[in-house]
Structures are given as structure tokens and as C-alpha cells.
């Protein structure tokens, strides 16, 4: 099929009815005149017919169709645009079928006269008739966009020059032409590629570390440890499983050791490690009490690339605003985290996490500190989450620190108009009465005439640094004394031993002050200012008695006895001591 390459030409101009073919001598030039075209590429024909040059050419827009009869050596091109359409044709025309022969029309006139041809190859139209202009502006634009380098190339033995359309299959000449175009285009593409800077791809598909399971991050430069968990691999799946991130490390060796520990946890001691198994004996024993996820999480927390605000303790994070430490435990409230509170130190937050872990996960819980540090039984039996001191194991259970021991004096004298209220507080624990510290100084003062002054009344408080510290840290520094009317003089002992007579009107004294109510005689009672803290109460049962006069303030017991003594006319002893406790 490639060898059958003849041209089939036809004219785009109006056709005549005359249809003939004539073979002429080589000395006679065949002239083909377009009888209707008056313009050839916007060139007007001369108006004088006598001087008109009859130029032999095929129609200016001759579109040829190959009839598959041309040999392989013929020159053909796709959309061949020949600029010499109006050139002088001196070669013999190759006889071939024309489209006009099939359509029954002709556009050629044969003349035996000599033909005058312009040196530039311009053609003169023999007739100035209209109808030859077919969008010349559009054709000129098309020609300018599709010009061919070899415009003067002529086909061998082919006198037809014009706009040619090749409809043949691929020939050797056209293949050569196309190959040349491909070479030019390929060369251009290569030039563009060579001028473009090449982007180097580092370590793609290559090992970036000599250790197993370690890769170097291209951007950060840190070494990351990864492990492929094939336990979640489904049947028929070609992937290695799920990639487990073990943390980022500054040193390559640390990342390799993290991989070794994770591999030992996942696959046992038979797996391949970067370092000898003898170096991980301690870690192998520790990881037996942890799940895979928990152990991987512990490895991540120890890595240098752990998240911002992380703590070395499990379940502890730092708040990004106020900087306090928060404790959370996961997977206990459905699939969400349970917030445990905010704490001042990491250790407190870590203890809160440990207590919650023991509560929700029992004895198999993974804690930050040793489980013997906590009262596990109390935590497990508690209906709520006992975060705080109540969940800790108290080493000195027999030595709790109570808040305060207070005792009062009750007047049993017949001359007593207003007496003390006998008040008692009972605590749930009964322990021996003991004294923490003794005061060496005695404080003397007295009350006279109902007014305190530097002249008639002298209240002497010898302030020491320890006493001031105690008073500042006491829950209450002052106790009010109610106003009471009395028909006799009162004797009030403040901070020591006092002999005084006067009408009592009432005033405020510090907590821990010993008060002796004696209407007739004086009493000397030893007092120590810091006998405030005791471990237990002395009496298990105490009565609350109300005297007709009203209530008097309570006072702290001295260091010599468990009771406050009252000295009056009838003589007698006051009420037993009592204590006030709190759970702090």
C-alpha cells in the first residue's frame, strides 16, 4: 500500500464544461489558466487582455489526493504548502488521474503560444472575473502560521504546485520528514530539561542508618525508630502490617535501642536486635508486666522528640497557659480520657494517675511509683475515686496529728452568779494524752475594773519567735468572751498567775489562754502558752452542762494535768479536758 502514491488533484475554482487532456511537445509549454480566478494571493490581473500573460499553472489552491499509484521515491508531505504555485512549469506533467475527471469538470486551457513568466513567479490572471476570492485574509493567516522551510522544493516530474493535502499511508519520504521533525522536537525538549535544575531525591528507598528499624528524617535530621506490627495483618494482605512509631532521638544508637526493646516486647527474645540480648536483661523483666501499647508509650515518653509539655511521668501533662501539671487516664470513660485534676508538681499529678490506674485496672495497673506506696485495699474498696491523702499508705498510723485540745473551767462555787458552760467534744479515736512541747516562760497579767490600761491593768505577753509563729498559723487567734454581770469581784488569770479583784465585764483573749474564774480568792495556775496540740482525749464520755449565768470561753489545758482546777470559796475542780480534731 505504501508504494501506491499518485496524486489526485482538483481545483477549488468554478469549472468549465470542456474536459480534455492533451499531450504536447517538450518545446510547447502547457499553460493552465484559471478562467474564473482574477486574483492570486491578493494580486490583481492586468486589465488588458492582449498584454495579459497566460501563465500555466494549476489552480492556485490545488488540493491533491494521492491515488496510491506513485512510487516510493516521490516527495510528499502532510499539508504540503508550496509557495511556487505560480512558477513557470517547464517540466513534463506526469499524467495522473484528476478529480475533475471524476467530477466531469475542467479548469485548464492548453495553449501552444509562448508564455511570458515573471521572474518572481507571480501569475497574471487571464480573466478579471469575480468569484476567485475565498477568504484571502484567512488564507494568508493560515499560510503565515504553517509555513514550510523548504518552500522552493519541487516535486520530481510534477508540475502542480499549490496547497496539497496528502491522504496516503506513510511513505519513506514522509517518514524521513517526520523523523527529522521528531529529532528537532526531541532536541528542544532535551535542552529545556538540561537547563532546569535537577531536584535531588535523598535516601528515597535507601537505608539511612546502619541499625535495624532506624531511619533519619530528611527535614529534622533526627533519628526515628519504627516497628512493623504484623499482628494486625489481615489474610491476603501484602503489606508488612501497621507501622508503630517509637519516638524520635538525637542519637542513632538510642533509636536503635528503642527498636530493640520494642521488638523484644512484640516478638520475644528470639527476634533479631541491634545489640546483644544480654544488655536488655533488666528491661525484659520490666516489660513483662506491661502491654504492648503501654510499653510503646513509655518508650515514646523517654524519647527526645516527645510532644511539647510532656512529663517524664505517665499520664501527666503540663498546661500550656498557667503551667500547672494535669493528670489524665485514658480508656476508662468509654473511649475517652478521664481528667483527674490539676496539681502543683509532677509527682502529685503522677500519684493521682497511679491511684486512678489502681482503681480502674486493679493490681495489674502500670503505675509511676511502686504500688506499695499506696493503700491499695482502700483504693479498691472506695466507691469513688479517692484521689488525695486518704489513698496514700500512712507509715505512722498510730501517730496522727490532731488539730487542737481544749479544756474549760466550770465554777462550782455557791457564790458564783454566772458560771462556765461545761463543753465536751468527742473524737472517734481514743489515744493517750501527751504533751508536745513545754513553755519555759510564764506570762503574767491581770484584769482590773473592767478596763485594760498601762496604769491599773498590766497584761504581760512575752513574745517569742516560736510563739508568734504558732499564733499566725493557728486556725483561730482570738476567742470572744461574752459580757456577764456579776455581784462580786472577778479574778481572771491571763497568761499566767494573777491575784486580782474587780468587776468583770469581758474582753477578748488569745486561744490557748488559761482562764480561772474565782470570785473570792486568788488562784495560781501554771500555764504554758503552747500546750495546744495533743494526740488524743483523756475522757471517753463527757457531759455538756449549762450554768444559769451563760457561756464562758473555753481555754487550753496546761502542761501539768489533764484538768483545769478551779479555786473558789467552796473549793472544787473544773470539768475534764476535751479535744477538737480535724482530718487535715
UniProtKB/Swiss-Prot annotation:
One GO molecular function term?
DNA binding
Region (Disordered), start-end ranges: 150-180
- Its function? Transcription factor that, in opposition to HDG1, promotes cell proliferation and morphogenesis via transcriptional activation of meristem and cell proliferation genes, but prevents differentiation, especially during embryogenesis. Binds to the promoter and triggers the expression of epidermally expressed genes such as GSO1, GSO2, ACR4 and WER, and of HD-ZIP homeobox genes including PDF2, HDG1, HDG5, HDG7, HDG8, HDG11, ANL2, PDF2 and ATML1.
GO CC entries: nucleus
Q: Which residues bind DNA?
A: 210-276, 312-370
Known tissue expression = Mostly expressed in developing seeds. Also expressed in roots, seedlings, and siliques, and, at low levels, in leaves.
Bilayer-crossing regions: none
Q: Quote the PANTHER family the UniProt record gives.
A: AP2-LIKE ETHYLENE-RESPONSIVE TRANSCRIPTION FACTOR, AP2-LIKE ETHYLENE-RESPONSIVE TRANSCRIPTION FACTOR BBM
Keyword vocabulary terms for this entry: Developmental protein, DNA-binding, Nucleus, Repeat, Transcription, Transcription regulation
GO process terms (BP): cell population proliferation
List, as start-end ranges, the regions of compositional bias called Low complexity. Answer: 164-180
Q: What else is known?
A: Was named 'Baby boom' because overexpressing transgenic plants exhibit several spontaneous somatic embryos.
Location within or outside the cell: Nucleus
Species of origin: Arabidopsis thaliana
Q: What is this protein identified as? A: AP2-like ethylene-responsive transcription factor BBM
Subunit comment for this entry? Interacts with HDG1, HDG2, HDG3, HDG10, ANL2, ATML1, PDF2, HDG11 and HDG12.
Q: What Pfam family is a match, any one?
A: AP2
Q: Which family does it belong to?
A: Belongs to the AP2/ERF transcription factor family. AP2 subfamily.
* Organism classification: Eukaryota, Viridiplantae, Streptophyta, Embryophyta, Tracheophyta
Amino acid at each position: 500500500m505504501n508504494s501506491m502514491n499518485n496524486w489526485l488533484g482538483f481545483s477549488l475554482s468554478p469549472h468549465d464544461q470542456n474536459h480534455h487532456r492533451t499531450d504536447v511537445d517538450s518545446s510547447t509549454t502547457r499553460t493552465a489558466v484559471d478562467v474564473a480566478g482574477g486574483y492570486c494571493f491578493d494580486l490583481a490581473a492586468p486589465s488588458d487582455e492582449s498584454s495579459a500573460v497566460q501563465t500555466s499553472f494549476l489552480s492556485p489552491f490545488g488540493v491533491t489526493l494521492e491515488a496510491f499509484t506513485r512510487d516510493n521515491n516521490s516527495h510528499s508531505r502532510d499539508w504540503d504548502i508550496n509557495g511556487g504555485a505560480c512558477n513557470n512549469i517547464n517540466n513534463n506533467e506526469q499524467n495522473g488521474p484528476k478529480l475533475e475527471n471524476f467530477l466531469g469538470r475542467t479548469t485548464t486551457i492548453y495553449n501552444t503560444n509562448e508564455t511570458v513568466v515573471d521572474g518572481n513567479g507571480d501569475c497574471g490572471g487571464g480573466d478579471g472575473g469575480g468569484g476567485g476570492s475565498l477568504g484571502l485574509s484567512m488564507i494568508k493567516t493560515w499560510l503565515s502560521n504553517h509555513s514550510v522551510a523548504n518552500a522552493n522544493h519541487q516535486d520530481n516530474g510534477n508540475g502542480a504546485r499549490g496547497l496539497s493535502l496528502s491522504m496516503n499511508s506513510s511513505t519513506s519520504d514522509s517518514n524521513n520528514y517526520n523523523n527529522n521533525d521528531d529529532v528537532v522536537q526531541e532536541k528542544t525538549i532535551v535542552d529545556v530539561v538540561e537547563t532546569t535544575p535537577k531536584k535531588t531525591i535523598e535516601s528515597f528507598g535507601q537505608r539511612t542508618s546502619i541499625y535495624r528499624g532506624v531511619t533519619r528524617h530528611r527535614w529534622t535530621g533526627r533519628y526515628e525508630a519504627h516497628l512493623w506490627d504484623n499482628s494486625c495483618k489481615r489474610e491476603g494482605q501484602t503489606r508488612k502490617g501497621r507501622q508503630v512509631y517509637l519516638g524520635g532521638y538525637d542519637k542513632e544508637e538510642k533509636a536503635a535501642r528503642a527498636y530493640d526493646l520494642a521488638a523484644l516486647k512484640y516478638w520475644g527474645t528470639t527476634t533479631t536486635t541491634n545489640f546483644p540480648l544480654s544488655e536488655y536483661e533488666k528491661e525484659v523483666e520490666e516489660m513483662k508486666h506491661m502491654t504492648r501499647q503501654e510499653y510503646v508509650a513509655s518508650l515514646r515518653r523517654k524519647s527526645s522528640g516527645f510532644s511539647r509539655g510532656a512529663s517524664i511521668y505517665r499520664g501527666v501533662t503540663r498546661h500550656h497557659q498557667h503551667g500547672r501539671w494535669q493528670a489524665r487516664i485514658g480508656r476508662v470513660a468509654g473511649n475517652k480520657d478521664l481528667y483527674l485534676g490539676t496539681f502543683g508538681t509532677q509527682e502529685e499529678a503522677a500519684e493521682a494517675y497511679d491511684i486512678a490506674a489502681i482503681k480502674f485496672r486493679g493490681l495489674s495497673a502500670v503505675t509511676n511509683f511502686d504500688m506499695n506506696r499506696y493503700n491499695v485495699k482502700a483504693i479498691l474498696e472506695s466507691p469513688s475515686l479517692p484521689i488525695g491523702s486518704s489513698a496514700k499508705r500512712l507509715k505512722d498510723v498510730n501517730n496522727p496529728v490532731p488539730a487542737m485540745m481544749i479544756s474549760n473551767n466550770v465554777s462550782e462555787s455557791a457564790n458564783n452568779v454566772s458560771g462556765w458552760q461545761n463543753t465536751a467534744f468527742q473524737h472517734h479515736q481514743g489515744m493517750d494524752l501527751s504533751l508536745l512541747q513545754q513553755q519555759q516562760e510564764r506570762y503574767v497579767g491581770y484584769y482590773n475594773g473592767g478596763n485594760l490600761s498601762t496604769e491599773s491593768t498590766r497584761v504581760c505577753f512575752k513574745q517569742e519567735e516560736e510563739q508568734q509563729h504558732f499564733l499566725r498559723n493557728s486556725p483561730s487567734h482570738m476567742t470572744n468572751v461574752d459580757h456577764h454581770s456579776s455581784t462580786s469581784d472577778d479574778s481572771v488569770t491571763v497568761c499566767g498567775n494573777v491575784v486580782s479583784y474587780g468587776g468583770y465585764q469581758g474582753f477578748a483573749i488569745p486561744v490557748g489562754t488559761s482562764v480561772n474564774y474565782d470570785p473570792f480568792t486568788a488562784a495560781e495556775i501554771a500555764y504554758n502558752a503552747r500546750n495546744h496540740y495533743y494526740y488524743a482525749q483523756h475522757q471517753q464520755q463527757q457531759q455538756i452542762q449549762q450554768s444559769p449565768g451563760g457561756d464562758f470561753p473555753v481555754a487550753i489545758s496546761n502542761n501539768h494535768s489533764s484538768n483545769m482546777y478551779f479555786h473558789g470559796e467552796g473549793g472544787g475542780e473544773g470539768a475534764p479536758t476535751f479535744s477538737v480534731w480535724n482530718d487535715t
